[in-house]
């Protein structure tokens, strides 16, 4: 997974891993691509997706807003990342991927609703809505 604060966060880092996979002929190793983590480093996610087509198998989806206090995670359809456009771009380059949701809602009484809304949003975007 491309994780902030590690040596794997930029497109170049991910491509190095991809080239390593190629050099070693590793058939069952793929990249777990976290869109939000990448977006924080480089907002033009759509430009890296075609380059990593061969290596990504798993897409991790979460969204956030940013202000003077830092990053605050929100439901998928309410944040800074335009998942509808990004998922459309993903569909242009991939046939078979696994998508997952990550929800950081801290208030227990809101968590189920945030997960439900995020799931419905992701499902809509995946299915062309």
Regions found by a protein language model. Give the residues of each.
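Histidine-acidic metal/acid-base catalytic patches
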Residues: 8-33, 39-129
């Amino acid at each position: 997974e491309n994780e902030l604060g590690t040596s794997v966060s930029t497109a170049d880092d991910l491509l190095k891993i991809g080239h390593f996979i190629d050099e070693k002929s590793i058939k069952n190793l793929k990249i777990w691509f976290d869109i939000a983590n990448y977006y924080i480093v480089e907002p033009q996610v759509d430009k890296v997706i075609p380059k990593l087509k061969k290596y990504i198998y798993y897409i991790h989806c979460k969204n956030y807003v940013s202000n003077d206090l830092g990053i605050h995670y929100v439901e998928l359809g309410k944040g800074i990342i335009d998942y509808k456009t990004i998922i459309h771009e993903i569909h242009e380059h991939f046939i078979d991927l696994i998508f997952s949701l990550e929800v950081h809602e801290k208030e227990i009484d809101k968590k189920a609703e945030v997960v439900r809304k995020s799931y419905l949003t992701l499902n809509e975007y995946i299915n062309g809505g």
